[in-house]
Amino acid sequence: MPTPSMEDYIEQIYLLIDEKGYARVSDIAEALSVHPSSVTKMVQKLDKDEYLIYEKYRGLVLTSKGKKIGERLVYRHELLEQFMRIIGVDESKIYNDVEGIEHHLSWEAIDRIGDLVQYFEQDEVRVETLRGVQKANEEKSN
């Protein structure tokens, strides 16, 4: 099982390959705001653990194992962003909040959050009811 740091790299590599068709060390470093040497070390570790295949100066490709995990990590991130929007978290805070919690939730918790997101999305009245509860709570606290 990948560590949270490994997950961040796999997720970013998956997104870059999906967007550009490839992922270079420099692109990964820029996206994660880390030094290229840190990326090289992690990519070598991910290669050793068979999440990707890395050839120096030639680039990297995700293995089927890496693609599967990358897809699941992107799903988790997007789902948590959806959840944050539904519960009314300010848009400017969503990314950092998701980054702060995504590695600490079990996949069972993610699946249950997915159920909850689906529940709210099936009927807009449910979201409106939640907004009413939130408004009432805000008025009580003021």
From Swiss-Prot:
Show the taxonomic lineage.
Answer: Bacteria, Bacillati, Bacillota, Bacilli, Bacillales
What this protein is reported to do is described as: Central regulator of manganese homeostasis.
Cite a GO CC annotation: cytoplasm
Q: How does it assemble?
A: Homodimer.
Q: Which UniProt keywords apply?
A: Activator, Cytoplasm, DNA-binding, Manganese, Metal-binding, Repressor, Transcription, Transcription regulation
HTH dtxR-type domain span:
1-63
Known regulation of activity: DNA binding is strongly activated by Mn(2+).
What molecular functions are annotated in GO for this chain? DNA binding; DNA-binding transcription factor activity; manganese ion binding; protein dimerization activity
For the keyword Repressor, the answer is yes
Protein name per its UniProtKB record: HTH-type transcriptional regulator MntR
Q: Name one GO biological process term.
A: intracellular manganese ion homeostasis
